[in-house]
UniProtKB/Swiss-Prot annotation:
This is Chymotrypsin inhibitor SCI-I. Inhibits chymotrypsin and thus avoids the accidental chymotrypsin-mediated activation of prophenoloxidase. This enzyme is required by the insect immune system to produce melanin which is used to engulf foreign objects. InterPro entries: Kunitz_BPTI, Kunitz_BPTI_sf, Prtase_inh_Kunz-CS, TFPI/VKTCI-like. SUPFAM superfamilies: BPTI-like.
Amino acid sequence: DKPTTKPICEQAFGNSGPCFAYIKLYSYNQKTKKCEEFIYGGCQGNDNRFITLAECEQKCIK
């Protein structure tokens, strides 16, 4: 059995990962029910990250 991963929009908001790049991306925040900007470090993190606000909203806001 494969471990089930949470749907992208339910994964932790704004997971920057351990690296030190400075990439502005968007992530869905379950607490505010909005897509918000965060800084991504460039490696690891999770799948709750989108290049544009529109892409985030299209995937996560019903």
